[in-house]
Amino acid sequence: MNDTLVIAGKHYRSRLLVGTGKYKDFAETRAAIDASGAEIVTVAIRRTNIGQNADEPNLLDALPPDQFTILPNTAGCYTADDAVRTLRLARELLDGHALVKLEVLGDPKSLFPNMPETLKAAETLVKDGFEVMVYCADDPIQAKMLEEIGCVAVMPLASLIGSGMGILNPWNLRLIIDNAKVPVLVDAGVGTASDAAIAMELGCDGVLMNTAIAAAGQPVLMASAMKKAVEAGREAFLAGRMPRKFYSADPSSPTAGLIGS
């Protein structure tokens, strides 16, 4: 089945995107990402060395850009100006790379997005030639505004970053999905494989996660589980689930021709 994720005109086989933080070392990072099957890996530019610090280990030695699509992100940014400045630095470090993940946080406790600053940054970045995938609240109106600005994907949170609380508001996610003309990916809050499957069954185009894999007891094994969950959820969405029924007068096995009837 030729069913690919298309972002900014590029096709990807995997619908699972993964982060690179919180692992014990770069070797574990690489092993988990290999197990996940992810092709897009996101990197926090303010926290991870991809060349800006020559004396420190470079993540790109473990995850070469010719093997993965590197997605720089603005984790740790609380203003539009900080986010724009960070992504311009990333573009320099990655030789003009345009695909980026924008997140502008509202408060350090919840890490909930600051949507006015996110909208402001998105507008600046799109005008500056970036292809913006954007972390946002699960607000259908604001998600549509980001799409209309020109973002190439909208990424509403399922629940708070790092919380592992799963899909808390499936109805808003469905509204965003139904209204969108760009890919919709769940970003933040996934805790285990069933959460990823549910997101895909709702019709999300993909799932981005980090802590759910990196903080698992066995990150490499969890990465493999997430790969399978995303694939299963996507196939279930495409197949179409049976209607929900409170009672069923339609048994699975036919009643005609029963012995003794």
From Swiss-Prot:
InterPro entries: Aldolase_TIM (IPR013785), Thiazole_synthase_ThiG (IPR033983), ThiG (IPR008867)
UniProt-listed Pfam families: ThiG
Active site positions, chain numbering: 101
A GO BP entry: thiamine diphosphate biosynthetic process
Places the protein is found: Cytoplasm
Binding positions (1-deoxy-D-xylulose 5-phosphate): 162, 188-189, 210-211
Taxonomic superkingdom: Bacteria
This protein's pathway: Cofactor biosynthesis; thiamine diphosphate biosynthesis
Enzyme category, top tier: transferase
Entry EC no(s): 2.8.1.10
Keywords annotated in UniProt: Cytoplasm, Schiff base, Thiamine biosynthesis, Transferase
Entry keyword annotation includes Cytoplasm: yes
Molecular function GO terms recorded: thiazole synthase activity
Gene Ontology cellular component terms for the protein in this record: cytoplasm
CDD domains on file: ThiG
Main location: cytoplasm
Catalysed conversion reaction: [ThiS sulfur-carrier protein]-C-terminal-Gly-aminoethanethioate + 2-iminoacetate + 1-deoxy-D-xylulose 5-phosphate = [ThiS sulfur-carrier protein]-C-terminal Gly-Gly + 2-[(2R,5Z)-2-carboxy-4-methylthiazol-5(2H)-ylidene]ethyl phosphate + 2 H2O + H(+)
Task of the protein: Catalyzes the rearrangement of 1-deoxy-D-xylulose 5-phosphate (DXP) to produce the thiazole phosphate moiety of thiamine. Sulfur is provided by the thiocarboxylate moiety of the carrier protein ThiS. In vitro, sulfur can be provided by H(2)S.
PANTHER family assigned: THIAZOLE SYNTHASE (PTHR34266:SF2)
Subunit text: Homotetramer. Forms heterodimers with either ThiH or ThiS.
Similarity-based family: Belongs to the ThiG family.
Protein name: Thiazole synthase
Gene: thiG
